[in-house]
Structures are given as C-alpha cells and as structure tokens.
UniProtKB/Swiss-Prot annotation:
InterPro entries: Aminoglycoside_PTrfase (IPR002575), Kinase-like_dom_sf (IPR011009), Methylthioribose_kinase (IPR009212). Homodimer. Catalyzes the phosphorylation of methylthioribose into methylthioribose-1-phosphate. ATP binds at residues 38, 53, 107-109, 242-244. Pathway: Amino-acid biosynthesis; L-methionine biosynthesis via salvage pathway; S-methyl-5-thio-alpha-D-ribose 1-phosphate from S-methyl-5'-thioadenosine (hydrolase route): step 2/2. It comes from Bacillus mycoides (strain KBAB4) (Bacillus weihenstephanensis). Disulfide bonds: none annotated. It is an enzyme of class 2 (transferase). It catalyses: 5-(methylsulfanyl)-D-ribose + ATP = 5-(methylsulfanyl)-alpha-D-ribose 1-phosphate + ADP + H(+). Pfam families: APH (PF01636). This is Methylthioribose kinase.
Length: 392
C-alpha cells in the first residue's frame, strides 16, 4: 500500500490490525502532537494506552514546500533502542517500528509532564539533573571510541547518517540566526541588538568554528535536539524522547543544548527564582563528570584511557564545547525559526523584550568567551555579569 498519513480513525485501525487492541475494543484516539515534524496520536481503550508517532514527509511548521525524508523515523526508533541498551530507565519503551509507514509505537508517558511546561509552571524536578547527567554520560561514552571498539563504532556511525535533520541543525542553529535569512522570526524591538549581533565578525568566526565542529566531529551518538521539550519529567522520573535528530556528533552538543534551555527558563524568571535552574545546570555537569569518569576507568576500551592525564583534557574540551553550543542555542531559540514558550510566553512586553535581549547577549558572550568558563562556577559568574547589564 505504501506510505500514507494516518488520521485518528486510521491510527485506531492500524493499532487493532497490529494487535495492540481487540478488534471490538472501544478505542479513543486523539492527535496530541505539538511538534514541527510529526503526527503523534494517543490511543486508549480504558485499560491500556499507547502512543503512535508518524514522521511526515515534510515539516509541519512550514508545509509541503519543505520536504523531509521519512527515514528519520527509523533513525529515531534505533536511537531509542540504543539509549535503552545503556540507560533503559530514561527512555520510553519502543513496542514496534514500521519503516514503510514511518510509524513507531511507543510507551504512553501521559503520567509525566513535558519538562519545559513543568519548569514554566514552577516545578522543580529534583532528580532531573541527576538523570540527564547519567543519561548523557552513558550514551556518549558507550557510543564513542572510548567505550566502543573502533570497528563497531564505524558501523554504528553509518547507521545514524541523518542528512535531512542534520541540515536543519546546520541552518537553524549555526547559520540563519547570524544573518539576514527568511527563517528568522523576532520582534522589531530587538532589531538594534540583532544588527549589532550580525555585524560582530568575531562572533561569526566563532560560530563558524562551532558549525565546523558539528559537521566534522563524529565523537559519539548524540540526541541532536535535547531541549526541555524533548524530556518528560515527574519528581521521580525522567524520560528522554524524540531523538529523530540523532546522529554522530560532538560530545558537547547535547550538553550545551540542554544547558541552554535551562538558561532560557532562568531568564524568564525573576532573579530570586533562578536558583533551581543553576542547581540543575551545575548538577547535570557534575553527574556527567562523575559517571563518565567511572565508565572511563572501569569500561574504557581505547588504549589511552589508561593515561591519567587524558581524561581531564577530554572533560575540559567537552565542557568548553558545551558552553559554545549553548550560546548558539540561546540565540537560535530567541530569533530563529523555532522559539520556546519560556520566553515567548512572558505576557508583559517589556519583560519579554528584556529577557530576549538578555538571551542574545548571553549567547553572544558564551560563544565568544567560552574559554572564560573554565569550570561551572565561572559559567555562573559570566551569566550574572552579562544578564545584569542588560535592560529592556
């Protein structure tokens, strides 16, 4: 029959035909997706529920004028299975994948809340940073040359060649927000700050270097879009979802994206309410270092993991890269194609513009002066110095 787009009715038919519900079951289906690239259906018969996710052959946010390969659904399914191999507690269960229809049937996580929404609503999620730090350490280590034999790594790397979605990252994170491109989207009150940003040749040179790192450093399997909208949370659980951007890339990329999205939430808050975000930023890094170090010492397969001076260099490089990637993400999410509710949801215009100016200034500083952030404490200092000097 070939590919066709599911509807709520045909999603029910698909689920019944594949044995997820009895033929006579009274199944309720709702399309619940709010993303840019897929349909997401929740199906429930009152006793059990599942999620059916289908990749569309175009970007919903733009329309059919932006075609995309549906093979990304297979990449997403494989990535979730790789993640589950190393950190099963932090990803949903994948029940099946249909490559022809680009359909993946996965565990329903309705008991949890999208982390971005929870943070905006004031939730703290005390275990978020511990779980994400551990998730990142295990996935990045075990899919790198340090935790995987080089032959196996090369094979796995080939599995995750993801040209369509990697091109989106190249354009929307590293290129378009730094010049006059039609994809950019911002309020006119920001124009003077943006003009200054776009005329900063030192900044552009640094961004060029980070784009080059993304293009060429195939260090480990990365999620590729690890923002707080790609994580479900509760006070006791954390689940990473939507790795359709998964590819081999730099160690620091996912860490930087996650940190940037915590910073965006921090910027949406009054100063005295930001401490929980810095707790998570600092703890994410410390848990990452703790877990990565244990794996390096106990599970390292590369000969030079036995050299004691090598690990500190690796960790410093990862952190420095993460800071720069975080800066790119801050700018992209403020003036690029895909914004975040943390900033756009600020009702008071003056406060919203101030927060966005702060995000742009902070992003610029993190990219240009990432070397100033030699450790997590200096990172916080740079935040305070930069944000404190920006007014609406």
């Amino acid at each position: 029959m070939g590919y066709y787009s599911l509807t709520e009715t045909t999603a029910i038919q698909y689920a019944k035909e594949h044995g997820y519900f009895e033929k006579k079951a009274n199944v309720v289906c709702h399309e619940i997706g709010d993303g840019n690239l897929n349909y997401v259906f929740k199906l429930d018969d009152g006793e059990k529920s599942i999620i059916i996710k289908q990749a569309l052959p175009y970007a919903k946010v733009v329309g059919e004028s932006w075609p995309l390969s549906i093979k990304r659904a297979t990449i997403e399914s494989k990535a979730l299975q790789i993640f589950a191999k190393y950190v099963p507690d932090y990803v949903p269960v994948v029940y099946s994948h249909d490559e022809e229809l680009a359909v993946t049937v996965i565990e329903d996580l309705s008991r949890l809340t999208i982390t971005r929404k929870g943070l905006i609503d004031g939730e703290g999620y005390p275990l978020l940073s511990q779980h994400i730090g551990r998730f990142l350490a295990h996935v990045l280590f075990y899919t790198s040359d340090f935790g995987l034999q080089s032959e196996e790594k090369r094979v796995l790397e080939g599995t995750f060649v993801n040209p369509d979605l990697s091109k989106i990252t190249e354009d929307l994170v590293f290129t378009d927000p730094f010049g006059h491109y039609d994809t950019n989207d911002y309020e006119s009150d920001l124009q003077s700050v943006i003009d200054e940003l776009w005329s900063d040749k030192t900044l552009k040179l640094k961004v060029a270097q980070y784009k080059y790192k993304f293009l060429t450093r195939k260090e480990a399997l990365i999620h590729g879009d690890l923002h707080t909208g790609s994580i479900f949370s509760s006070p006791s659980e954390t689940k990473v979802i939507d790795p359709e951007f998964a590819t081999y890339g730099p160690f620091g990329f996912d860490i930087g994206q996650f940190i940037a999205n915590l910073l965006l939430n921090a910027l949406s808050r009054e100063e005295e309410k930001r401490s929980v975000l810095f707790f998570h930023i600092e703890k994410t890094w410390s848990y990452f270092v703790e877990n990565f170090t244990k794996l390096w010492i106990g599970e390292g397969v590369e000969a030079y993991t036995k050299e004691k001076q090598w690990l500190p260099i690796i960790l410093q490089n990862i952190f420095t890269d993460a800071v720069g990637f975080a800066g790119c993400e801050l700018i992209r999410r403020t003036i690029g194609l895909a914004h975040v509710a943390d900033l756009d949801g600020i009702a008071n215009k003056e406060n919203r513009i101030q927060a966005k100016k702060q995000a742009l200034s902070l992003g610029r500083e993190l990219i240009k002066y990432e070397a100033k952030c030699a450790d997590i404490q200096l990172f916080r200092t740079l935040f305070q110095q930069t944000v404190g000097g920006v007014k609406a």
